[in-house]
Structures are given as structure tokens and as C-alpha cells.
Amino acid sequence: MITLLFYSGECMEISNTYQCTTEVMKSKFIAILFPIDDPDLFKKELAKIQKEHSKARHVVYAYRIDNKTKSCDDREPKGTAGRPLLELLLKKDLNKVALVVVRYFGGTLLGAGRLLRTYVQSGVNVLKEASIE
């Protein structure tokens, strides 16, 4: 697969959608990284993902569109999901990009620390899939 990255000012943008699955203690985390340039379009894409994964326990996300950033923990403990994903996007200087992680609960509580590490690892894994390391 050819990965297309290009610079917009000082930030990188992506042109494709990437997906990667991580499993921890029977919970499945599906990370989806995709280009987005409008918050309203993001809402539509998020709704599609939520519908496709309607049996998932959580759908957390972060996005950056120019100077606008947003993140959501979707009922996970505060600060364990959305914000760390946003920090990944900012650290990699990515712009016009969204990172959504869908969690299917595996029956075992992970605890805040392991939960945070797993969401971050899911984000790192999909960034590697997109050749952004």
C-alpha cells in the first residue's frame, strides 16, 4: 500500500483511511485514522462508525482540523481515552485528521492505567499502519 502524506504549512495530512485492531484481556480496540476537513463531516463519519459498531461499549475519538481540536472519552474514565489520542495527533503534527477507537468490552475491567495505555497503543498501532512513526 502506498501511503500519501503531504505537508500543509508545518503539519502533515493523510489522504487515506487506516484501521488496526488491538486486543487486551479479551477487549477489542479498533483504531480508525482518517482524513477530515470539516467538523460537520466528522460528525457524519462518527455516526457511520457508531452505527457499524452498534454493539461496541465505547467509541472514543480525537480530531484536529486546523486550529480546532476535539476529543471525547465516551463514558470511559476521564482522561483515559480521547485526550491521549489527541495528544498523539498533536505530537505527530497531524492536521485535518481524526482518530476514532471503538472498544468492544471483553468482560474484564482494565483499570484506568491499563485502559489509557491500551488506547494510546491502539493509536500508535494505526499510526504505524499509516507509516507515521
Task: Label the model's feature ranges.
Residues 73-78, 82, 86-88, 115-119:
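Conserved mixed alpha/beta catalytic, RNA-binding, or beta-rich assembly cores of soluble enzyme
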Residues 63-64, 95-105:
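Glycine- and acidic-rich phosphate- and metal-coordinating loops
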Residues 70-72, 102-108:
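Short hinge/gating elements
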